[in-house]
Amino acid sequence: MNLSIIKAELLEAEKVLQAFLADEQNLKNIEKAASLLADSFKNDGKVLSCGNGGSHCDAMHFAEELTGRYREHRPAYPAIAISDPSHISCVGNDYGYDAIFARYLEGVGRKGDVLFCLSTSGNSKNILNAIEVAKAKGISVIALTGKDGGKMSGLADVEIRVPHFGFADRIQEVHIKIIHILIYLIEKKMA
């Protein structure tokens, strides 16, 4: 009986990935995002990543594999996940949770940097606020979204959307694949 559940879960994950692959624009946007990131690094820029919940963990994972390593040894790339607990608790307390990413970007973000956002709904107010600050500062925006892109649709320089309207975990599974592909492409572009 559990084998049927396991198989159904894996088949659903496959279906979501196939729907993502069916849209050629998604593949082009991954290439565009990798170029944007590599160009930023080559010009002394950095990437600042953010997300909420599981997407927050993915934002940290992305930054960690850029500053640490992915598969092979190579120079570290400048990446910061906006995840400092003292910053989040201070800004959350003093300004509200909707300001946690925007406030960090105000202090640390510079023209030529890239804001890398993850939101399965595309409606996270704290990320929308960060995008607004990024645009005002000349910071490029890459957004990994799901469903119909939500309020983030059309706001990013590059949006990579997983067109799934079910549970968020299926969207996150594709997001982590995108993250790994981006790192692989960045390494090739930086070599």
UniProtKB/Swiss-Prot annotation:
Origin species: Psychromonas ingrahamii (strain DSM 17664 / CCUG 51855 / 37)
Superkingdom to which the source organism belongs: Bacteria
Name of the featured protein = Phosphoheptose isomerase
Record-level GO BP terms: carbohydrate metabolic process; D-glycero-D-manno-heptose 7-phosphate biosynthetic process
How is this protein organized at the quaternary level? Homotetramer.
Which HAMAP family is this protein grouped with? GmhA
Which pathway is recorded for this entry? Answer: Carbohydrate biosynthesis; D-glycero-D-manno-heptose 7-phosphate biosynthesis; D-glycero-alpha-D-manno-heptose 7-phosphate and D-glycero-beta-D-manno-heptose 7-phosphate from sedoheptulose 7-phosphate: step 1/1
**Which residue range or ranges hold the SIS domain?**
37-191
Disulfide-bonded cysteine pairs: these are: none
**Which gene holds the coding sequence for this protein?**
gmhA
